[in-house]
Amino acid sequence: MGACTNSNYAMQYELPGTYAPIADFDLCRRAAEAAEKFGYNYKVGNVFSSDTFYTENAHNDKWINMGVLAVEMEAPALYMNAARSGNKALVICTVSDNILTGEATTAEQRQNSFTHMMDVAFSLL
């Protein structure tokens, strides 16, 4: 539901502290309800967003110990832009590759999981 980051994206807002980018609760609740209704496997929680997705010293174990579910690259910027413009936002991620194990989904698994993500997203409209 939130997005941790090592990016300096928030600096542009010149805030006197650290901004914690989060999803809109209503969108998150409705997306979880839709995933339940469709019978899809899903998780709700924090992601880690980085400007460098693959890096030699990512400290992934430390993020895992903090309960972070996945690594991606855009969530904080989306949440901050939405907050700044007075809009709601929700990041819905579909896991295709495991950067810890090297495991990757097949083309068929990827197609199905992306379709599931789109079903949930379209249900929010």
Predicted regions and their residues:
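Glycine-rich phosphate- or other oxyanion-binding loops that anchor nucleotides, phosphorylated ligands
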Residues: 1-125
